[in-house]
């Protein structure tokens, strides 16, 4: 944004300039009331349509507590408490309400999709990326959640994967659809494959969902998506899979489906373009070849998706789908008018040339020389980069015009991150920062319109991470840093701004300053947990520090393992600061439900900024945030200039106003999975079970299956831990014996509960082995209440004496066991002080108050006034 535009903005009451374009999305005030260390912070949206004279009143439980607020859209109520009802009232009589949270986050439970088998694995589901859209047109956002199984695969890796599942919720967790969308086995699950478009595409005020589908994909009503296609598509064999023995999808029908956001129903399905072998407009199943750069079903399975306004903001938007970026790069622009999906154009970036086709396959434009070939990134960005009133598509090292032409390319190739924003506020248009994966590696900042290089450097290896953010106030414009080194540099001229760098992940507005902070999930691969935090720049001490830790606020978990991104970061509620959505950490993914956590800032601010979702570049960023390696959204204008803030004298906020920590309590019932012991014949103690006490368990694991010895005594015993009842279990497995000459199946013959001698197993279960094969078999047994133990008995007669050793080694299953439990009223976690004179002396007492130093395993004792199990 130029200084002349800033002056014009100042003279017109600080309205946004023409470069900060607006979208036509119905937005209400979306008030939120967050508990802080100082009371309750109430905030609400400022909108670009607000008159300058508009003021706000705030009511608590019907009583007016603040009047005629005009210069901010947040108010701290020192006397507020969780559960209070707040009403925000405008001077025009508009009202909206919110109930105060009991912390700086709220949570809701969602039902986990059932595990799904694929090949020799079974995927258990965890929340992954989220998108947001108003699916019913009421001015409130709904959440669209993509579930990924724990056997999801990178496109570059072999292995079976279970299907992608998609579900929809209101902000309070209410599920919207009759069924989840299930993309089926012919869509491989992973970060590179399924990119969701959630946006109002036909102008009816309600968001649709678009994504790639295939034979076997089903919609939110349970119907096959092929039923919404033409006659040829309707004839698809939805029972057929094209998954190879290595878990790759080698061929088959490829579709694009648009779903009704409110019901999940497939409204229209067409053939996906291009096909996996580069077919421009296929009309039948295709088979892969090396068109996209390799022949192992990897580079053809790299996708991005976005939305762009190619006719200007007063016309309907267009969905953008990209396939391929390491070599041939195809970008497909698709319109939805409420009844039909149609091709606007298809851009093809080939080696030494590019061309653009219309929906009939006729060439609209073409040119030899530089192209978008090999210039893509694990992401995509949208914006009117040259202020001509039309969106351009930034794929990384190249920009595509609204007509599908190549606008520019740097020729610097592929990278893992992209940041499109007003990085250089004194320069016309928008700029791009990106790191580079391919030689000569390094990084660059370039003009998104011309491709001219502003800052660049080369390196000696893959530069896998990079971030651009306005992090240091005194440095005008954005700064950037990357994995190449530890230095923070200016996007404007490349000069060193700071000798250290913060996290290289997401930028965020949280503290109330008109400058960026950083967010990172800090994934720990050894514990499979996260330690999310926000970092800030302290202008007084000239240092980078952690402003806010999240681990003790609901035990949140970030997405995408080492990428450690939020499910979603966006300005969803309250004023202009951004919300963070994550899910609660779990030791496994076996419980029937999981918690979604929504965080909103507890920090007051003196700045009034229109809802970020009204800025076009930012709103488009929320659409594409889920694409590939999730990237943070950026504004299309320079916020300090809009607010008239001088960064050279600015002092950042350094004190968090977060409330006391809060751990979300576990459910009273749930599911827990058998874990692998640290050593052979080891004992594993879970929350509800103890296993391996008779030496059944080995330390060997494969694809989530544990080797469990059925032993020479032909039995396995699981003990029930104090404070729990086990009410059901599921065992999935197969015999470990792989004889090629005989059936070596193992039979489960009985299930016995506690001390009862009655077998509750309804029929013998065969776990196949040898010539019977090694495909997993699943059996669920429930309807009981085990208080002490569960005994499983087996028939190992198919395993001959010659094939077994002294430990019954070959009498073993590859098994996955999950237990359904409920907590009992054992009061183990309740305070118990009746017979204990000194409750907090750190010593161990029996239940009758006698001190002991020889506590026995499995018994209940008292320490520091609380019961525990040894």
Positions of PLM-derived features:
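Extracellular carbohydrate-recognition regions
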Residues: 658-691
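Residue-level detector of functionally pivotal "anchor" positions at catalytic/ligand-binding pockets or at interdomain
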Residues: 658-659, 822-848
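Terminal, low-complexity interaction segments
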Residues: 757-824
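Beta-propeller-forming repeat regions
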Residues: 24-30, 37-39, 46-51, 68-659
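Solvent-exposed loop/turn segments flanking beta-strands in beta-repeat/beta-sandwich domains
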Residues: 47-61
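Terminal processing/anchoring signals of secreted or surface-associated proteins
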Residues: 1, 20, 729, 826-831, ...
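Short, surface-exposed beta-strand/strand-loop-strand elements in extracellular ectodomains
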Residues: 598, 737-756
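Short beta-strands within extracellular/lumenal beta-sheet-rich domains
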Residues: 702-725, 734, 774-779, 813-818
